């Protein structure tokens, strides 16, 4: 018998929360606002990486979401970026696991992954399920046929399992030699490990223990972003200059 993953309950949004979320979404300086909220939550620097991770999680709602692999040496800050981004996303929009077995994704409910964020803190945790993840990213769905026996007659029969995507994948890794095919389907981000960034992190950690840096507003900021995510609706986008966009033709990946 397949145990289903229990989806978190979606809290009822108050009028105050809704207005705050709409104010965020209609801010002409939305991207700087997002960066400021990351900083308010204690994550310094990494401006480009912050925006890429945030937008990749928003892309879960698109027909072909982005996937991100955050790479760094141990204790260099990849997990901080990973956690800070997910805290801005509604709990019901994400599935977080430490590891996946080879066929675990096939036995989820049909729509349990659809337009969700699949987050695994270390790439090694998905090594057994890498084939399923590649299929999910390239085809947007999974299907599995399993041979079983009928309990009453003992006759063989085939059971079919189908799981619909798409899904946005968020991973971290310390390895340079991970699954190349999986990495090819992700945007690989390198965390800043320069001394200046380390010094800024140390300063932020010291400030966190002062009265002004106690972080009392952090939960308010997270709630505002989560409510904003719940208000997002699908809208068509037209790029007037799309025909003028060009890319290198001597490489298939950049």
Regions found by a protein language model. Name each.
Residues 10-95:
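P-loop NTPase catalytic core of nucleic-acid-dependent motor ATPases
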Residues 15, 159-168, 175-254:
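Phosphate-sensing "switch" segment of ASCE/P-loop ATPases
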Residues 53, 85, 133, 145-148, ...:
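Conserved RecA-like P-loop NTPase ATPase core
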Residues 63-68, 114-116, 166:
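Pre-Walker A (Motif I) flank of P-loop NTPase domains
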Residues 73-76, 83-129, 195:
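AAA+/P-loop NTPase substrate/partner-engagement loops
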Residues 98-103, 131-165, 210:
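Substrate-gripping "pore-loop 1 plus following alpha2 helix"
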Residues 115-146, 174-185:
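Conserved AAA+/SF3 P-loop NTPase catalytic/coupling segment centered on the Walker-B
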Residues 121-124, 147-154, 164-176, 192-193:
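A short beta-strand-to-loop transition that corresponds to the Sensor-1 phosphate-sensing loop
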